Curated annotation (Swiss-Prot):
The keyword Cell inner membrane does not apply. Gene3D superfamilies: 3.10.50.40. One of its GO terms (biological process) is chaperone-mediated protein folding. This is FK506-binding protein 2. Its EC number is 5.2.1.8. The gene is FKBP15.
Length: 151
């Protein structure tokens, strides 16, 4: 009986360790930027202070989509670097070309922090955004290009 109890405690410890390691692997501590598509010509680039228009799909690390401008067919517009969006966006969209698509993996400290944004975004959540820059100041993509929901 004592041997079984030790075995059971050891098994529970191993499973708990694996779960903690799996969560840690999904979380990031620094902003990660992946370029998914970049136009051959980059004549218009996003800089701090520019008014940008961005299509996006936001997901948690488990794949749960919490928001998407693609489904609404309504990109968000804001001043880049002006603190109107989460810090991960202000940093991750800098230098993006008009028509470029990026995947941003944003740690909680550059997202919604430890408080999250209940009920859809839990505290401490790493966020994943598929983004497409569809407008910079007075320049924009044609409607045909900006309505694609596949990144």
């Amino acid at each position: 009986m004592k041997l079984f109890s030790i075995f059971l405690i050891f098994t529970i410890f191993i499973i708990a360790s694996a779960l903690v390691a799996a969560k840690s692997a999904a979380d990031v501590t620094e902003l990660q930027i992946g370029v998914k598509y970049k136009p051959a010509s980059c004549e218009v680039q996003a800089h701090k202070g520019d008014k940008v228009k961005v299509h996006y799909r936001g997901k948690l690390t488990d794949g749960t989509v919490f928001d998407s401008s693609f489904e609404r067919n309504s990109p968000i517009d804001f001043e880049l670097g002006g603190g109107q969006v989460i810090k991960g966006w202000d940093q991750g969209l800098l230098g993006m070309c008009l028509g470029e698509k990026r995947k941003l993996k944003i740690p909680a400290k550059l997202g919604y922090g430890e408080q999250g944004s209940p009920p859809t975004i839990p505290g401490g959540a790493t966020l994943i955004f598929d983004t497409e820059l569809v407008g910079v100041n007075d320049k924009s993509l044609s409607e045909e290009k900006s309505t694609s929901s596949e990144l």
